[in-house]
């Protein structure tokens, strides 16, 4: 029972860290265009992170991404020690990339840690390879979708607004950026909170198989406090902010105007809602980065700082294997006690 409580606590801590680690995804463009101050922006994003709970519960009527994450590992192999190892590895990698100002994926960190510890514990038979491969494909597909949608949407908006006075257009797009930022924050809450829900669900299922009182038989029995806690934790984390990554996302990839901020956030939100519909966990970091690149590419390819982009992509590719290896090492240490 104590181990289960520790895992749930650490998972919610990870969710909180995810909030301030990924806060930049929702607010970087709205801060860089000076529509809101950093403080105002994190409050705005945190509020809509939590609104996502009610959308998932009352409108969507379920938590499909949480179900996908909980099934990353074959149910018969799920155990509390390797879940603990995966969560610890995810926290360590997330804090390291936050400290370095690298916008890596909290989502893939968590899934990589979960899978890596499972492989260390039971071998490759323990993981659902089809789910892992689907998630891996969307490491590249999600930012590509965001980039293509943003590129096309930017050209469309520029054509529609070609006769508008620049000052009038900027005023309207600054107002619209409040809406686009809110839409993206809802997508962030929907996507990222459910990943932690999936891990907690797996822990509760493992607890049930071990005869512990708090356990559940399947994710369909997941109590409401799990979802409420996860959405609350990510909202509180978002309020804490992540200013190093805000700078990278908002200014280092490409300079962003209010019009471009609206387009990038709208394209990013579209991608997140699409993957929510498909029940595939994706990275909000990858998604908004792809959208920002798509916006920058409409000016000219040289407007995108490809050196920064390459370093981001390297971090993305390394996230799952590094967090997986780290989780495997931690599991080896945990089993010594």
Q: Where are these predicted regions, by residue range?
A:
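Multi-pass alpha-helical transmembrane bundle typical of ion/small-solute transporters
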Residues: 1-337
